[in-house]
């Protein structure tokens, strides 16, 4: 048997779930919730119960005795009225027992239409037509004229049941056509098919509404009265055409008390005494004023009626506008009176009975004041659409509140819903000209540029593709590309004003010639490796620096300050090794004078030529020191001759280059060299301002285990003081300690003074410029700005490199890779190692430096090497025992060096091992076939041959050539000289040669014996 849910049955019966559950409970049918299931017979019982009661309702009518029984002074159950405030609270949801279309019975009319009073027996119809036909101010709905077949369910909670009449009175159904129609608020044309939300009705003692208040869908075009009501509606429609408007005074009752207190009016045609009705009316007014406690919240919502009912109202109003027997209620609030709309019937259910409220007089007045402010109730607008906005309740979605066309009649369809309007497409606002200018750095990410311009990144990528630039969202583009693509979108790009330049320009004071003083010269000693540069400097400084150098060679720049009898000289000792090109270049840039050391017995070497080029590029004068004059094979003329070929012509030969012959071993010529240096510096007129902010260059930098980043700097201008904020390259800090070249702490350093400083935030690069600032905050700002630019450049470089490698590697074999982690003691050595190692990269093997830095090898380096499968190279650094143990556990290879030669040679050996071998063919010998012999029992053909060159030997491959074409490539099966098997046959001898699986040997063929030789790739070794 099929079952049905309670909520489904309620939907079919046009009832709320709560109302149906109440009905089921009254019928002793078990249903716990709206999801409970009901049998078919149960559904039939419910339908029969509801429909049967409705049929009775059409045949009976409430008598006046019922009303008198419902009028106690207190809200007792005997009262059958529900005040407007309670009806408003339910808002039409009291219609618990809404039935399908059918005739309305008297029982149902008695129970559901509780506010409807019994009609009086006064022969009003005989006296005047205005008493049995509602005037324009009569807000009573002629419900029988409305089509009861279109029933709608309200969406609010049902009204509370106060009392069900025990004995509903019976009355002829023909009386229904005499019930006056209610006031029409919205016209049928204005709100077609609008569902009515009935209002609570107050009942006077002598007036009764004979019809139940149902939620009826009112449509002037669709509503048709039943039976005898149709004739009356047609008559009313004709009357409406004759009188289209009603004067305002017709809507006001003569009795002011009746305007204030009476809440509903129904005109009876019963024979009742008018005086008695008026007396009881006044009696009831006092009771209602005392008992009302809540305002009529939905007083403004009116019941829409059909056009026929409206016509009847207007017609009857013109016939007897001032009749004293007309109802004591106004249809709507007038401009002057406190009267309220009376015919707003509540949407009560079958069992609902209206209870009068208390203390609603003040509420009435306040409501009427609001209506007056809104201008409701003027002349000619008795049926004004004041209740139109609230005559139908519905669920409104949040998005509907923001759509246009949601209010007014034009935006509504015939079914009462609002038409959906097309949403407008978002308009792109064009920024002002001043805002179409973007400031960027040297590089910028594509997504960031698109964000600043307010466009989509995809559109920018399309433009770049059209310009021939393949870019991704996260890829960086340079300033020029950004300018071009921004111009496509009518944007202007300019470089951001560098904040650091503004800060640094403030520090740069104008050079005052009066404050300039002479400063010591900065001399850089350059030359080829092992030509005695450091030894010469040791003699000058009277120290033993060279003996402490690993391998006897200098591997980083040393800055020293030497005091002589004639003045102070600052020396910079640079490496002479080929790997330290950048150091020599940097030394030449920060120096005033270059001393080129050349060994008298060795002459000009490659690094000597390089030093000459660096000096010329820096436009620095050169003084040549011919060293090792104490050796037997010393030839200074040879040195002068070779240097003249490179543009350095000695003064003795008519040039301008000073030559000094010295011996670092014996000390010969040292004083003369110093005199020449000071003489040259006087010619240069070297001066500086010690009072200006300190500036200079970083000569060397390293990471000390105990002190942190340590930088060796050379002050060019001004005076550097301890505790002063400085900026060195990408890093900044406050100077904590300053140490001179002798290891002593100093408080200040003047021009041309080399010192070591401690306190920077990181290890700067050698050659970076440093500037002393007044504020540590400014120093940090400049440092952060430089760091940001550096990161952007690195990111752009990586992005381009990745794309280039991707295109190169497409379709190519996998390239082997040697990964390294390099740690060095100073930044200069680290830089030299990186440059030298990267030059060793081959096409078959790529070298990747995963990480490089200064300082000791730590645990993080070992972890990184374990993850990336890299080799750790330590240059002049050693790990701690804990790091060694960790490297052993992680199986990480660590190598330690003190001399750069050994590092480079080992790297070359590793590259050689990774490079694939090549195979070469080596011809061992050739032999010509002079005759052929066939061995029948073996099926072999032997070629009698003569060895033309080389030798023919077993174990090698052999090929047969005929007219230069290879006919066979196989191995020797037989090699004999006469009848003896031999291992090989030398040049000029004859032999018999047989080839495996080949017998087509002819006279004149050539046997060629060869082997395939595997050759390992070789990388040139650096000579120690």
From Swiss-Prot:
Residues 527-534 are annotated as: G1. InterPro entries: EF-G-like_DII, IF2_II, IF2_N, P-loop_NTPase, Small_GTP-bd, T_Tr_GTP-bd_dom, TF_IF2_bacterial-like, TIF_IF2. This is Translation initiation factor IF-2. SUPFAM superfamilies: Initiation factor IF2/eIF5b, domain 3, P-loop containing nucleoside triphosphate hydrolases, Translation proteins. GO terms for cellular component: cytosol. Residues 552-556 are annotated as: G2. Residues 573-576 are annotated as: G3. Residues 663-665 are annotated as: G5. One of the essential components for the initiation of protein synthesis. Protects formylmethionyl-tRNA from spontaneous hydrolysis and promotes its binding to the 30S ribosomal subunits. Also involved in the hydrolysis of GTP during the formation of the 70S ribosomal complex. GO terms for molecular function: GTP binding; GTPase activity; translation initiation factor activity. The lineage of its organism: Bacteria, Pseudomonadati, Thermodesulfobacteriota, Desulfobacteria, Desulfobacterales. Residues 365-375, 407-423 have a biased composition (Basic residues). Residues 518-687 form the tr-type G domain. CDD domains: IF2_eIF5B, IF2_mtIF2_II, mtIF2_IVc. The keyword Nucleotidyltransferase does not apply. Residues 627-630 are annotated as: G4. Keywords: Cytoplasm, GTP-binding, Initiation factor, Nucleotide-binding, Protein biosynthesis. Belongs to the TRAFAC class translation factor GTPase superfamily. Classic translation factor GTPase family. IF-2 subfamily. PROSITE patterns: G_TR_2, IF2. Its main location: cytoplasm. NCBIfam families: IF-2, small_GTP. Residues 316-325 have a biased composition (Polar residues). Residues 43-62, 135-148, 167-198, 223-263, 332-350, 394-406 have a biased composition (Basic and acidic residues). It comes from Desulforapulum autotrophicum (strain ATCC 43914 / DSM 3382 / VKM B-1955 / HRM2). Residues 33-425 are annotated as: Disordered. GTP binds at residues 527-534, 573-577, 627-630. It is found in: Cytoplasm.
